[in-house]
Amino acid sequence: MSTKLDTILENPQYAILCGITVFTLFIVQLSLFDRGRNYPLLNPKGSFEISTNRVVREFISDSRNLLEKGKSLFKGQPYRANTDWGEVVVIPPQFLDALKSHKDLDFTIPAQDDSHCYIPGFEPFDADPNLSKVVIKYLTKALNRVTGPLSEEASIAFRTVISDSPEWHEIQPQPAFVRIISRMSSRVFMGEELCRNEEWVKLAGDYTVQSFKTGDELRMYPRWSRPFVHHFLPSCKEVRRTLNAARNCLNPLLERRNAIKAEAKAKGEPCPYDNSFEWFEKEYSTHDPAVAQLNLSLVAIHTTTDLLMETVFNIAQHPELLAPLREEIVRVLSTEGLKKTALLNLKLMDSVLKESQRLRPALLGSFRRLAMADVTLPNGDVIKKGTKIVCSTSHMWSADSHESGEEFDGYRFLRMREKEETEQGKTSHPHLVSPSSDHLGFGFGNHACPGRFFAANELKIALCHMLLKYDWKLAKDAVPRSASFGMILMPDLRTKLLIRRRSEELDIDSVES
């Protein structure tokens, strides 16, 4: 008997299946307690099905088409859907302006739950409000003085990761860009010494990739089963190992850092450091430095790498953009230097980035909120307390929101910007960092991404280096295809780039910052 039990426990998939089967027998049909029962359900479970596991898995594998179906069926009215984020009420985008600052709609609780921060190893996904405070209070205010360090680190990272070879060579863009953005972000967050610690850079990049991939795997299981399932999943164990390795990597570095700070204090000298280690110490009474740094890295690395990759793909498919983008960089940086204000004047680049994000935002569902009390919608309907709402992002590429909405147009938001500048009082939100109900790439409302200003600067600096120093094209004339996985809209990870060093028109490494 014990031998059979040992065999079961040694087989993770069998153990998981048994566990789910046992627990499912005790699950009461959740539909009896639906908080949004007055809305039609897009993908109901079968009459004899105990759980929604099948329909959720179908949603995960075909979410983009299902959300388009919901949009077509319910025509601007709220509806329910069984998703990898649980049962949600999908609200139409025309409701967003009225709800964007609603005090009873909370982002933190559903974000924490959907990111599995209750599972050991996923602590860096904790949507702590103090993180937003750190970003707004320290990082955003430091933008002007970090452009130089960001550019310096970008130069080293591109040379290390992409190489200076003038010959065409093939790269896998996702891991390459993860390393580059990790280095750039860590330069600001952790300082020059630590950002060049290859062990830390690798661990931060590995944790980002592993945790998001494992999170996707966990969403294949019912929410109630995940606190049990994670014990058996090798990927969850790997996430925990990487987090512990990150802690072990930082400990000796922090000890040396603290000794230097203590020595400076004893001499009556100011603290020699001004980066996120100090920011967190000022804002938190107690915190785990590795978790805090990985929290910042998750926010900075994943979404920034994602948008950089998509933009590089789009430029490769529209090579006519290369010359005007390079001309803009040379004109702006040669006259204004590498400053925050100069980056704001890279208007075509800003438009290309925003257009890339419009056509493939990181999520198929934005404005994720939990009703903390009954909330009245603009049409008079009442969302009951405890209901999770979300807005599909499919309208971002719809002709209802944008002319020729399904086509890439790198000049789209530049034209809007120029029109806005000539028409006083008109606001079309053409800037990359300006969220609107028509463009949810950085979220919307009170909980729009607080790090978007830093991300925009980091992206522009990375693109300045790449455009000036490299030629690139898609390998084997590939056409990148995004893929949906539940509420996540992923880039094409199979597409490779051919890239080579070129002679730049402007030596960006010599531009004054």
From Swiss-Prot:
Glycosylation sites: 130, 295
E.C. numbers: 1.-.-.-
Binding site for heme: 449
InterPro entries, per database record: Cyt_P450, Cyt_P450_CS, Cyt_P450_E_grp-IV, Cyt_P450_sf
Membrane disposition: Single-pass membrane protein
Keyword Heme in record: yes
Subcellular location: Membrane
Enzyme class per UniProt: oxidoreductase
Membrane-spanning intervals of the chain: 13-32
GO BP annotation list: secondary metabolic process
Pathway assigned in UniProt: Mycotoxin biosynthesis
This protein's UniProt keywords: Glycoprotein, Heme, Iron, Membrane, Metal-binding, Monooxygenase, Oxidoreductase, Transmembrane, Transmembrane helix
Primary role: Cytochrome P450 monooxygenase; part of the gene cluster that mediates the biosynthesis of equisetin, a trans-fused decalin-containing tetramic acid with antimicrobial activity. The PKS module of eqxS together with the enoylreductase eqxC catalyze the formation of the polyketide unit which is then conjugated to L-serine by the condensation domain of the eqxS NRPS module. Activity of the Dieckmann cyclase domain (RED) results in release of the Dieckmann product intermediate.
Family statement drawn from the similarity comment of this UniProt entry: Belongs to the cytochrome P450 family.
Protein name per Swiss-Prot or TrEMBL: Cytochrome P450 monooxygenase eqxH
Source organism (scientific name): Fusarium heterosporum
